[in-house]
A protein has these predicted regions:
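Metalloprotease/metallohydrolase-associated module, dominated by Zn2+-dependent proteases
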Residues: 1-61
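Non-catalytic terminal regions of proteins
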Residues: 1-8, 64-314
Length: 314
């Protein structure tokens, strides 16, 4: 969305799509523009906002981007408490802290409102992170510290993710989980300000901290301005033992089963792959690739989730 002039922020309760005993509803934060457009301010908007702010601060020649989602966090800060956002590091710190919660949009807005009521302007963006680490959190009905919550949630997420593809044949998938979660928990425990420190180390090509992180954990799938796709693997790993592309494939299968989506959005990525031959099935029935000799990530998930032979009712 190229231009989005924020005029209203609204909270809306939403029932979770899958019943469980712990969470019945979630809070969606809705942003409304002067033109009447409505968008959700949640994890994607916060993540993209933080990344775009950091890109502008540590790279050269950064291009302008649509207001939503890339400027969403800055727009919310300008709307609620503009004084807080005069130092962009404050916004980055708030984004980073809120992304550690299950309802980041709700926490982002609530925290800004608390800061405004207290007239709190940090002398250093680290104080924003400290605010969260000094405040107890509620996790699955229990009061925990931020560090305790981080460790227990990281372990739980790792256990759940490994259930998607089980067995020794899928160690490349488990490698990604161990590497990313292990790094994330370890780095946050050792240095809770590491996101801020990346920016403070300045220009990306001369940034020793970012270079170390990329060497250790690589980078997610990247799409550049030429619509080309790239991945940076951790040092010592090859694509054969580090299956990063299975994570977007999980989303594609979910979109098919829960939303009736027939097209696989990984087509641009697979078109660059030396092994996957994109054809009409990818647009109309990607699950039918389960009979191929070489299974793409979508088909591999479909087969190993015992869905072979199942045809979705769209």
């Amino acid at each position: 969305m190229a231009e989005f002039f924020l005029v209203k922020i609204k909270r809306k309760r939403k029932k979770v799509p899958f019943q469980n005993d712990l969470v019945k509803e979630l809070t969606n934060v809705i942003l409304k523009s002067a033109k009447g457009d409505k968008v959700v301010f949640g994890s994607r908007a916060i993540m993209e906002s933080m990344a775009y702010m950091m890109e502008r601060m540590i790279t050269r020649g950064s291009v302008s981007a649509p207001d939503y989602p890339y400027n969403a966090a800055e727009m919310v800060v300008d709307y609620i408490y503009p004084e807080f956002g005069k130092d962009k590091l404050n916004i980055i710190a708030l984004c980073d802290a809120c992304m550690q919660f299950s309802e980041p949009g709700k926490i982002f807005v609530q925290t800004l409102e608390v800061f405004k009521s207290q007239k709190f302007i940090p002398d250093n963006a680290n104080q924003v992170i400290d605010h969260f680490y000094s405040t107890p959190c509620i996790q699955i009905g229990k009061t925990v510290s931020m560090v305790q919550g981080l460790i227990s949630m990281g372990m739980m997420v790792g256990d759940r993710l490994k259930l998607y593809l089980q067995g020794n044949d899928f160690m490349p998938f488990s490698n990604v989980i161990h590497k990313l979660l292990g790094f994330g928990m370890n780095e946050r425990i050792k240095n809770r300000y590491f996101m801020l420190d990346i920016v403070r180390k300045d220009y990306v090509l001369d940034n020793p901290l970012l270079q170390r992180y990329i060497a250790v954990v690589g980078a997610p799938i990247i799409k550049d301005c030429n619509e080309d796709y790239w991945s940076i693997l951790p040092k010592g790993f090859s694509s054969a033992d580090y299956w990063i592309d299975y994570f977007p494939a999980i989303e594609q299968v979910y979109n098919c089963l829960s939303k009736g989506q027939t097209i696989c959005d990984m087509i641009p990525w697979c078109e660059k792959s030396p092994k996957v031959n994109v054809d009409d099935r990818c647009y109309m029935e990607p699950w039918s690739r389960v009979t191929d000799t070489y299974l793409c990530p979508y088909a591999m998930l479909w087969k190993n989730w015992n869905l072979e032979g199942y045809i979705p009712t769209i």
